Amino acid sequence: MLRTHLAGSLRPEQAEQTVTLTGWVARRRDHGGVIFIDLRDASGVAQVVFRAGDVAEQAHRLRAEYCVRVTGTVEVRPEGNQNFEIPTGAIEVNATELEVLNESAPLPFQLDDQVGEEARLKYRYLDLRREGPGSAIRLRSKVSAAARGVLAHHEFVEVETPTLTRSTPEGARDFLVPSRLQPGSFYALPQSPQLFKQLLMVGGIERYYQIARCYRDEDFRADRQPEFTQLDIEMAFVNQDDIILLAEEILTALWKLVGHEIKTPIDRMTYTEAMRRYGSDKPDLRFDIELVECMDFFKDTTFRVFQAEYVGAVVMPGGASQPRKQLDAWQEWAKQRGAKGLAYVLVGEDGTLGGPVAKNLTDAEREGLAAHVGAQPGDCVFFAAGATKPMRALLGAARGEIARKKDLIDPDAWAFVWIVDAPMFEPTADATASGDVALGHSAWTAVHHAFTSPKPEFFDTFDTDPDSALAYAYDIVCNGNEIGGGSIRIHRKDIQERVFKVMGISEEEAQEQFGFLLDAFAFGAPPHGGIAFGWDRITALLAGMDSIREVIAFPKSGGGVDPLTDAPAPISAQQRKESGIDAKPEKKSEDKKSEGDTAEAK
């Protein structure tokens, strides 16, 4: 090794020891001919002093981010010169030897400055030298190790599934890879290991996991990446409770890394309850605001706006004092979400109601409204009326915005909840409107994916009454973020074929795209289920980062661009020709197929 110690490990107990350190010059200071540098390596920073002689002369040429090797003696700093903000602040190294391992060009930005994301990603290798980004990547490694420890204890098998596979629709567009040896044909990068892990269960592996790379060619969305990582788990001969128990054990181990003890069992909430109370299937439970349904309260109203399928309200504590400009801003906020606006009532300090809605209400409605929605004098009540699903979503978003504006969220709190009993199907129009790629050609598509089992009580009716069918699925939510989701899978061929039929996937199409899975189900496939955790999101939460880009070593920027390598990039004409991108695939004849089968048999 080029060094004897890590810079961040030095303490007063090592005084008088001779040490050799390696790292980068974080800062350089010259005090009357005595040179001080802060030497940084992966473990931290130590102060090195060059006092006299040739070594001090050498140190004069040091600049920021020079890579160096230093030998010297550990000394306790004089009283009054300690820096208690860093672990090594009580010592310094009195240098006797200096070797410049590599010089550094002038930096595009100072590593201790606030820098724009584009520059940080373009020079990501410099960005990673900074304490925050570097620590986040190291935490990610610890997170993976902790999960592996739990799974090894339960005798799970880590299996690598293919990353070059066939294109099978799973809810987003595939990234396609041309096959040079079969011009005109393409592999697809996997959106998830879903089908392969189910085949592993059929194969008797029984307990599988993988820290899997996944790829989805989606339109740009905030804080999404075209390639991402999930902890993928599958188990045979289990029910929902078994999966949830294991998942909670993993989460408990992860959150211990940041000093938090998760209380288990984690509460469960049905999808219906979550939407009714919070307007979201991933509610942030760190604050107590809930939606209030007002259909019964306004059942005889003469106010036409409230003569709707759904009328709901959410209370903003102290919101009546908002200036008109802020109330108008709420209207623009709602319009950006596709609504016409956000109706409101202001509750005066004397309990009287004000605002444009109040004058349209009857005396009885005005008298009872505050009590019905739980509003106090000085509060503002926001309303949404119309179709149930979008209006609940609007109020759910308003709930979160209220909490942020009123500073109601404890940044140090952790609130977990399982969301269970979600619908199995949703109208295809709803899925496409939200930006998802709907699988199938009918009016219905799967909410989770096509391989999720219905709850047992819906086995006989899910295809005749898809609107009522519930999925045997479960999502885990932390602080308003969905950090994992899974389900009990379909393991019977007949049920899988019925699900495909509901989604408008013909027998021919099902056989072409999923025939290998349907064939496997015919050979004694066991009951099985699993879960996948969003590894980027979990690590970002544990690291206290707002964006998953902060915990990915080399992330993409908006639109899937990599500023570091300038990917994606055009390919050459020769590459295009060799890859066969423009070739039309040869139609496989039955004769050729038969010949291949015969040769294989020989």
UniProtKB/Swiss-Prot annotation:
Q: Which Pfam families match?
A: GAD (PF02938), tRNA-synt_2 (PF00152), tRNA_anti-codon (PF01336)
Q: Nucleotide-binding as a keyword?
A: yes
Residue ranges, compositional bias (Basic and acidic residues): 575-602
| Site residues, Important for tRNA non-discrimination | H31, G80
Q: GO annotations under biological process?
A: aspartyl-tRNA aminoacylation
Q: Which UniProt keywords apply?
A: Aminoacyl-tRNA synthetase, ATP-binding, Cytoplasm, Ligase, Nucleotide-binding, Protein biosynthesis
Q: Where are the annotated segments for Aspartate?
A: 194-197
List positions binding ATP: R216, D217, E218, Q225, E482, G534, W535, D536, R537
Q: Which GO terms describe its cellular component?
A: cytoplasm
Q: What class of enzyme is it?
A: ligase
Q: What is its EC number?
A: 6.1.1.23
Q: What InterPro entries is this protein classified in?
A: Aa-tRNA-synt_II, aa-tRNA-synth_II, aa-tRNA-synth_II/BPL/LPL, Asp-tRNA-ligase_1, Asp-tRNA-ligase_1_N, Asp/Asn-tRNA-synth_IIb, AspRS_core, GAD-like_sf
Q: Does the keyword Signal apply?
A: no
Region of interest (Disordered), ranges: 559-602
CDD domains assigned to the protein according to its UniProt record, in alphabetical order:
AspRS_core (cd00777), EcAspRS_like_N (cd04317)
Q: Which reaction does it catalyse?
A: tRNA(Asx) + L-aspartate + ATP = L-aspartyl-tRNA(Asx) + AMP + diphosphate
A single GO molecular function, which one? aspartate-tRNA ligase activity
What residues does L-aspartate bind to?
A: E170, R216, H448, R489
**Cellular location of this protein?**
Cytoplasm
What family does the Swiss-Prot or TrEMBL record give for this protein?
Belongs to the class-II aminoacyl-tRNA synthetase family. Type 1 subfamily.
The family database entries (PANTHER family) matched by this protein are listed as:
ASPARTATE--TRNA LIGASE, MITOCHONDRIAL, ASPARTYL/LYSYL-TRNA SYNTHETASE
Q: How does it assemble?
A: Homodimer.
Q: What does this protein do?
A: Aspartyl-tRNA synthetase with relaxed tRNA specificity since it is able to aspartylate not only its cognate tRNA(Asp) but also tRNA(Asn). Reaction proceeds in two steps: L-aspartate is first activated by ATP to form Asp-AMP and then transferred to the acceptor end of tRNA(Asp/Asn).
Q: What is this protein called?
A: Aspartate--tRNA(Asp/Asn) ligase
Q: Which organism is it from?
A: Rhodococcus erythropolis (strain PR4 / NBRC 100887)
